[in-house]
Amino acid sequence: SNRSCRKSVRRLKISINYFAISSELIVILTIVSAISLDLLLPRKLKYIVALVSILGSLIAFVPIIFQYANYSSPEILFEGSYVIDKFSLILKGLFILVTYLTFLLSVNFVESDEYYQGEYYFLLLSSLLGALVVTSSRDLLTMFIGIELASTPMFLLSGWKKGDQKSNEGSIKFFLLGVLSASLILYGFSLLYGVTGKLVFSDIANTLIQSDLNQSPVTLLSAIL
């Protein structure tokens, strides 16, 4: 029996459409490259980190164009928790372009000798990755992970100027507000899961439609949170 189990495990193959998540993979590769180069390169070559970040965000936009041009039907991945459809592609393209423009507009200030902080690129790219995850999330857990991944780097970016009192104050306030918001969102998700017993959005919708739970005060409270 043990041998048969081992054989079945060996035969099990997980098929993943890597092209569908190529933008996310490119952003991850850019994040790793940016933080590695910032650690390894001397100060006079730190501008390479900015070039890699700008180029990576631009390359991540290319698969979006091809996917949108050749779109036929939604691509559902990871047991239904991740979806690639036209709406998510439009939002992903928008987020990537905004990040790309942000890099272009801020690169001179970030690279100035007056106040250089190389983690700027790492944090902004990490926030972009979280935004991409949110746009394709199809269940509560994936959406919450994406929200946290997108918002947590912003706490640090708001306090980017460590020597500035206003920057530190803004970072602390943003952090406290973010923690409170995350707690309320997670509590709302837990109520919704407790009522329906489902994580996937479509399953939650079907459960609410097929029952009288959509009139429940708990469901209303979870929607508000």
For each predicted feature, which ranges?
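Alpha-helical transmembrane segments of multi-pass membrane proteins predominantly involved
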Residues: 1-225
